[in-house]
Amino acid sequence: MKHYIDPETNDIYAYESDGSQDAHIKEGLVPISDEDLAAMIAPTTEQLLSQLTAARKEQEQQGVTINGIRYAGDPGNRQALKEAIEFMEDAGLTEFQKWKCSDDEFHVNHPLADVFDAYRAIGIRRVALIAAEGEYAAQITAGTLTDLSEVTWP
């Protein structure tokens, strides 16, 4: 492909390299190199940082699995886990008669210990994800990370 820009509107046009579409190239369009095109369409630092934060939150949402049961790690579920743990501890109970997990399945006589372990594991994972996000954000700000496909999460 060969690319052109309209200097008045900044619209970018692409045409076949073989010349088969040359008759459609409007007068006044300016050819641009592949390198210039890549720079023009590359996300800004702010966009990359926003995308990075969204990706970290998506990782958090996945949560953890304890004894075959998934516990989501989003803020609402973290709060629900905390409240459930506090209630059970205040009531002196060690099992939930019924527990509805993050996959919308019900579990009978679900151990409080598993919920507590999940809550703790979610917190540990969240700390690791935020640390990784910080490292990647520094690389983005420095200009050494320009493609989030290179990001791997712990």
Predicted regions and their residues:
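A preference for well-ordered globular domain cores
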Residues: M1-P154
